[in-house]
A protein has these predicted regions:
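Pyridoxal 5′-phosphate
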Residues: 1-284
Length: 284
């Protein structure tokens, strides 16, 4: 019997409800979201919005319309970083970041003239809040941290960093690729302004799904521009969410699969799933 251990890359197998729900949508509906007023399109609209609501509930986010769907956490992080940072801005980040953050920051350093401070980690991969505070400058625009390292699995003190960032009026972006679906995340109490997540890891959804939770009033410049299904005579991207940051046809089948996975997680309970995982690693 094969044993699959590559869950930090993507989880497998998915709950059976995920492929079943995707198949049912493709075979029995197939309509696209935001592109029509006929029955199948309206049904697709409703299904997509239900997944926004489920994600908002999972992360204790107040407005489902500002749960933005993307193709991956990499796109979500690029959307936030490229959409916010301007020439002269300073960013504080950790030494444990994935290339989805690091390469984007280095590109912005080269192309836009931002500056970057890297907060070191100790031998256990832990970051001290005092070191984060010491890295802040007058021109610091944003702090971006991974919640859990994809290499070490170390959990970073995002609640403390969120308190620090909010007290200094600095935006706080969290990369929750490895933690969403594993650890409790509350964008309100942890003071997270922007939360980037993927659907295909511990949220148990299909590849090609991800998102950005926008929990702030920041004007984020769209990463791409294009059709949104409405305001077609307007020459620029609409200024309201989610259309402001979503251009092109959504991955409706993938989003519906992610919704099925979220239903599974709600039924099982995150804490119950965590206990099972812990038991696997601690059983002699």
């Amino acid at each position: 019997m094969d044993v699959y251990l590559d869950n930090a890359a993507t989880t497998y197998p998915k709950p059976s409800v995920v492929p079943n729900r995707i198949y049912d949508y493709i075979v029995n509906n197939g309509g696209t979201s935001g592109r029509g007023a006929y029955e199948k399109a309206m049904l697709a609209d409703g299904l997509v919005f239900q997944v926004r609501k489920r994600l908002a509930g999972l992360f204790n986010h107040l407005d489902p319309k500002t749960v933005i769907f993307t193709s991956s956490v990499t796109e979500s992080l690029n959307l936030a970083l490229q959409g916010i940072l301007k020439p002269g801005d300073h960013v504080v980040t950790s030494a444990l970041e994935h290339n989805a953050v690091w390469r984007c920051l280095k590109t912005l350093e080269r192309d836009r003239g931002i500056s970057i401070s890297i907060v070191p980690a100790n031998a256990q991969g832990e970051t001290a809040i005092e070191d984060v505070a010491a890295a802040i400058r007058p021109e610091t625009r944003l702090i971006v941290f991974t919640h859990a390292s994809n290499v070490l699995g170390t959990i970073q003190p995002i609640a403390a960093i969120g308190d620090l960032a909010r007290s200094r009026k600095i935006l706080f972006l969290v990369d929750a690729a490895q933690s969403s679906g594993v650890l409790p995340i509350d964008v309100q109490t942890q003071k997270i302004d922007l939360l980037a997540f993927t659907g295909h890891k511990s949220l148990l959804g299909p590849m090609g799904t991800g998102g950005l939770v926008v929990n702030c009033e920041e004007d984020i410049h769209p990463l791409i521009s294009g059709g949104t299904g409405g305001d077609s005579a307007y020459e620029y991207q609409p200024d309201y969410y989610p259309n402001h940051l979503e251009a092109g046809t959504l991955n409706v089948s993938g989003i519906i699969g992610l919704g099925a996975a979220l239903e599974f997680l709600e039924t099982e309970g995150l804490e119950n799933i965590r206990r099972k995982r812990t038991a696997w690693w601690t059983t002699p």
